[in-house]
């Protein structure tokens, strides 16, 4: 019986899972939309929702708690400066999961996880900035 099993192991060790979700949460915060497998998306949702709740609090302790979960300080800065104020009036439900078919290689169910009311220009913004910098260098 699987009673009281709190989360999926995803065939990884605890440290590997922790690093996986830290990286995925950072990517979601940076791009505001990512495509991944459905079980990973379902496990990522509560992690990101709790990070947004920390960003809504906005105090120093909340910032340090978020920094302990995320890999880069740029993610923490965007979380507290952009996403926290954006969802200040919303009581939960910051993330949406949409099914996206099956992966070609192994038929794994795929999903798109994104922020509700996301900034559509955020996805690919780093690539656009890098291309603009390359054009300026020429």
From Swiss-Prot:
Family, as annotated: Belongs to the bacterial ribosomal protein bL17 family.
NCBIfam families (alphabetical): L17
Ribosomal protein listed as a keyword: yes
Pfam families named among the record's database cross-references: Ribosomal_L17 (PF01196)
Protein name, entry field: Large ribosomal subunit protein bL17
Keywords: Ribonucleoprotein, Ribosomal protein
GO cellular component: cytosolic large ribosomal subunit
InterPro entries: Ribosomal_bL17 (IPR000456), Ribosomal_bL17_CS (IPR047859), Ribosomal_bL17_sf (IPR036373)
Organism: Dinoroseobacter shibae (strain DSM 16493 / NCIMB 14021 / DFL 12)
Database matches in HAMAP family: Ribosomal_bL17
A single MF term (Gene Ontology): structural constituent of ribosome
One of the GO BP terms on file: translation
Assembly with partners or alone: Part of the 50S ribosomal subunit. Contacts protein L32.
